């Protein structure tokens, strides 16, 4: 027997019973971002490797260990996108969208990272990305956070996700803090784990994000970035916090919050849940004013966020009842009436376009069809048999309530269904 081919580890199939949650989530994303008049942009999943090395940072875990990179037939180094911001900026510069313009853009699609697969972490994963260009102040950052909160409310998730904030300040203040942090950590290098010792010489800010419990006392005594902020950075962060307070958006200032991408400045934020274990971050973002210039464009203020759809789906399954709803399951009794049943079902769809109607065209027994009807979650079973066709009637059975089934003429069926809706 030929051995079957399996999916690549960490790249999972999304099965039909899961799709309703994905559709619900994706529709909510589109609805919320459109309400703020953000416009969709689409760009390739494959980019030149140099794009990510320049923007994400060569010393980051993503570039060092996680990217899917290959050489094509022309000898060019290409990479499956590990995140969307760099590609969005590249597309904006190349197509003239960013020069002296204000832009509000969004995208939704797959990203790829060679990480260790676990619950909520995959090698192919989907993100909603939202990016803004041309607006330098804290108000646009507040708008992004308001948008996130509106999305959580639309999904019914606002009670299980909380907001954490920090500021990295300007590049100058960040560099001053970096030096102070390195000096402190070097004085206690023997207490660091192997991963942190490596990061000490490549990306020391990432040590603050360590989940190793043995390092937490050491990190608690580390210099605080807020003590190295210049006055402009302080005012910026104070204004953002004031806006969130006025809008009654609860938040926690987390001084150890840093992002794993080198291009962030000023504000960074994460939306976090305690219901997914180690993979608690469901959305993250911040400001990255230097990124457009880094990629060859004119200096342009920019801010945005990305939300992980797989993690949001995991949360959705815990709070939303089954989203795969059927209104009517049409039971067709006997092969002789399948054609008539099919045509009648199509007529029902014509007059009830918002209803979900499934016709059983299997020709199997009534018992089997009623089992499938009940399992489908449908509210009604509509029975079409030879006797009903002769008398121009149908039998309507309520599957979710214990009430007598009804025999209705075809003329009275539609008004009755609409009244019972």
Swiss-Prot record:
It comes from the Bacteria. SUPFAM superfamilies: Class II aaRS ABD-related, Class II aaRS and biotin synthetases. It comes from Coxiella burnetii (strain CbuK_Q154). One of its GO terms (biological process) is histidyl-tRNA aminoacylation. It is an enzyme of class 6 (ligase). It catalyses: tRNA(His) + L-histidine + ATP = L-histidyl-tRNA(His) + AMP + diphosphate + H(+). NCBIfam families: hisS. HAMAP family: His_tRNA_synth. InterPro entries: aa-tRNA-synth_II (IPR006195), aa-tRNA-synth_II/BPL/LPL (IPR045864), Anticodon-bd (IPR004154), Anticodon-bd_dom_sf (IPR036621), His-tRNA-ligase (IPR015807), HisRS-like_core (IPR041715), HisRS/HisZ (IPR004516), HisRS_anticodon (IPR033656). Homodimer. Its EC number is 6.1.1.21. GO terms for cellular component: cytoplasm. Its main location: cytoplasm. Keywords: Aminoacyl-tRNA synthetase, ATP-binding, Cytoplasm, Ligase, Nucleotide-binding, Protein biosynthesis. This is Histidine--tRNA ligase. GO terms for molecular function: ATP binding; histidine-tRNA ligase activity. The keyword Transferase does not apply. It is found in: Cytoplasm. Belongs to the class-II aminoacyl-tRNA synthetase family. It holds the Pfam family HGTP_anticodon. The keyword Cell inner membrane does not apply.
